[in-house]
UniProtKB/Swiss-Prot annotation:
Cofactor note text: Binds 2 manganese ions per subunit.
MF-aspect GO terms: bis(5'-nucleosyl)-tetraphosphatase (symmetrical) activity; metal ion binding; phosphatase activity; protein serine/threonine phosphatase activity; protein tyrosine/serine/threonine phosphatase activity
Organism this protein belongs to: Escherichia coli (strain K12)
PANTHER family, per database record: METALLOPHOSPHOESTERASE, SERINE_THREONINE-PROTEIN PHOSPHATASE 1
Catalytic residues (UniProt): H80 (proton donor)
The protein's name: Serine/threonine-protein phosphatase 1
Length: 218
């Protein structure tokens, strides 16, 4: 019997030396490698967390997708992973292809099999990560946490978790979210990282010529 996808997942930071959080990678593997080298990332002692959207648009989507199988990487699901899973499950590919999924069609048959296997594993990606580190309690979701009060295992609209930009669009109100120290999101490409109270937006458009943002949580 197929297990339901987890919504929430917890990470205990004391298991790791350093914890790094990456903005949307979108197939930009070389940018990620350079950033990890610069921060002296150690895959045996450190953890890399992705805010989702490791695939599509960039040059190395398959390699980035396969990163999720490494013991030193974890991620929340992004809307692009969800589009890919939905496309393969339904065989309705048009939405995914219009949004950067054409790399999959260009793969050789054996590579498509590898991609399908990796995307099947994405069914186990949580929508929301709660990370307990030496710098506090961090909540990570791809686009938004669609409530003004965070609670572990609270029912929230998962479509908004993957797609919503409304909170960022209302940033002039300056309202944060209670229930954790920091909230981290990607999804909306920005020229630079945006911090509004305890809300942090770190998709800085690596695939569009911007820098890939890497944040040290511990």
């Amino acid at each position: 019997m197929k297990q339901p996808a987890p919504v929430y997942q917890r990470i205990a930071g004391h298991q790791w030396r350093h914890i790094w959080l990456s903005g949307d990678i979108h197939g930009c593997l070389e940018q990620l490698r350079r950033k990890l080298w610069h921060c002296r990332f150690d895959p045996w002692r450190d953890l890399l967390i992705s805010v989702g959207d490791v695939i599509d648009r960039g040059p190395q989507s398959l390699r980035c997708l396969q990163l999720l199988e490494q013991h030193w990487v974890c991620a929340v699901r992004g809307n692009h992973e969800q589009m890919a899973m939905d496309a393969l499950a339904s065989q309705q590919m048009s939405l995914w292809l219009m949004n950067g999924g054409d790399w999959f069609i260009a793969l050789a048959d054996n590579q498509q099999k590898q991609a399908k296997t990796a995307l099947e594993k994405c069914q186990h990606l949580p929508f929301i990560l709660e990370v307990h580190s030496r710098t506090g309690k961090h909540v990570i979701a791809h686009a938004d946490y669609p409530d003004d009060v965070y609670e572990w295992q609270k029912d929230v609209d998962l479509h908004q978790v993957l797609w919503s930009r409304s909170r960022l669009g209302e940033r002039q109100k300056g309202q944060g979210i209670t229930g954790a120290d920091h909230f981290w999101f990607g999804h909306t490409p920005l020229r630079h990282r945006v911090d509004i109270g305890n809300l942090h937006y770190i998709d800085t458009g690596a695939v569009f010529g911007g820098e890939l943002t890497l944040v040290q949580l511990q």
